[in-house]
Swiss-Prot record:
The lineage of its organism: Bacteria, Pseudomonadati, Pseudomonadota, Gammaproteobacteria, Vibrionales. Removes the formyl group from the N-terminal Met of newly synthesized proteins. Requires at least a dipeptide for an efficient rate of reaction. N-terminal L-methionine is a prerequisite for activity but the enzyme has broad specificity at other positions. It comes from Vibrio vulnificus (strain CMCP6). The keyword Iron applies. Binds 1 Fe(2+) ion. Belongs to the polypeptide deformylase family. It comes from the Bacteria. This is Peptide deformylase 1. The gene is def1.
Amino acid sequence: MSVLQVLTFPDDRLRTVAKPVEKVTPEIQKIVDDMIETMYDEEGIGLAATQVDIHQRIVVIDISESRNEPMVLINPEILEKRGEDGIEEGCLSVPGARALVPRAAEVTVKALDRDGHEFTLEADDLLAICIQHELDHLQGKLFVDYLSPLKRKRIQDKLAKIKRFNEKQR
């Protein structure tokens, strides 16, 4: 397994709409394993393939406290949304930024697991929010897209400043 590079906003590759996985192969399973390792290495609770410049419909999530219960969703599709919720979200592709995003409180999602078996999942609370956040990535959408243009610009400017600082430190 290997750690993949996470793209950061405003990288245009984050806007790419992911294509469905045609067949779960050993290559796809390696991508899944690398994504899980990357998610843990970056201390995230979710990661979409788009974030690591792989434009296929693959998501990994682990909201467990023990950080050893990874969930794999290949070709995920939300079948139903219920209620309203929202928490202050962050994102590995938008480091250091957080914002309140309106989301459904509960979702029903259909997907394939790491072995290509179809399953349906009823999710609520943090898991429901995380699923919606990661599936947005597969559509080329980021949580900052829910913000006002001014807030989005402030975040973009802050990230550019951090990037310039880091480049000077090298």
